[in-house]
Regions:
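C-terminal regulatory domains involved in ligand/effector binding and gene-expression control
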Residues: 11, 15, 19, 25-154, ...
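Intrinsically disordered, low-complexity regions enriched in Ser/Pro/Gly/Gln/His and often acidic
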Residues: 3-4, 13
């Protein structure tokens, strides 16, 4: 078992197959390139663990990324929730077995599985929260989801011992590191994707998104903040051939000092 830890940001990554010095591992990982446009589904080759502090709740959370069968999708499993007990008999989830195409087996009781889909998104204020029909939530999933998408991962079970994904260093880079340590495995199933056939525009307040037909995946972004600290206000990113890792994953969440008190009064930014 290998170990890599960064105490500067309070996060720890545990569980590589062989012990390597971080510098040696970094050189090896830099040679790995993933193409998000591949036609086959992918999962992780091995399970890998990490822990860190959650941004908004401030709690320390343990997380494990596990391989999953084709067509599973990205599913979060809240392992911190106790199953329902009736007359001394456990009638819930978590028995160490795996069923339903790689998902933890579930009997009756509270459903602790939360699939990461557009229709399970329940809140997007300051972070993205998903929620299942039983009311079980997982918050601040956006950096992990970006890393999974950017590295071409279609199927994974995310075991999370808490209500929120750890913030790590405020970017997607630690999650990319996790994925590369675990390795990728191609699956014998075609990737299912949404193809944009015509121009789509969405406006909401001062925000706007435009989707255009394309044979690949590229993103053009513009932001506007009343702050001299933000120099670059626009950018173009091509997500082919490792573009996410090269150009995007190290971008970190930022905030303004004037907003800290308000966020903490709302019970946010506790980490």
């Amino acid at each position: 078992t290998g170990l890599f830890a960064s105490t500067n940001f309070g996060w720890h990554i545990i569980g590589t197959d062989k012990l390597r010095r971080p510098r040696q591992l970094s050189r090896r990982l830099c040679r790995q390139v993933y193409d998000v446009n591949t036609k086959q589904q992918h999962t992780l080759k091995n399970a890998i663990n990490c822990s860190g502090v959650a941004l908004h709740s401030g709690v320390k959370v343990a997380m494990c990324l596990r391989p999953a069968a084709a067509d599973t999708g990205i599913v979060f499993h809240r392992t911190d929730l106790d199953p329902i007990v009736v007359d001394g008999v456990v009638d819930g989830v978590v028995d160490g077995t795996v069923d339903r195409g790689g998902l933890p087996a579930a009997r009756s009781g509270i459903d602790t599985l939360v699939p990461a889909r557009w229709d399970t998104v329940s809140d997007t204020v300051m972070s993205t929260t998903i929620c299942n029909d039983a009311g079980v939530k997982v918050a601040t999933i956006e950096h992990l989801m970006a890393a999974l998408a950017g590295c071409g991962i279609d199927n994974v079970v995310v075991e999370l011992a808490g209500p929120e994904v750890p913030i790590m260093d405020g970017s997607s880079a630690p999650f990319v590191f996790l994925i590369e340590c675990a390795g990728l495995e191609m699956q014998q199933a075609p990737r299912r994707s949404v193809r944009v056939l015509r121009r789509v525009e969405i406006d909401e307040g001062d925000r706007r998104a435009v989707l255009l037909p394309s044979d690949g995946f590229s993103v053009s972004l513009e932001i506007e903040f009343d702050s001299a600290a933000i120099v670059e206000k626009s950018g173009f990113f091509d997500l082919h051939n490792g573009g996410f890792k090269r150009d995007i994953c190290r971008a970190r969440t930022f905030g303004f000092e004037r907003e800290v008190s308000r966020l903490m009064d709302l019970g946010l930014a506790q980490g």
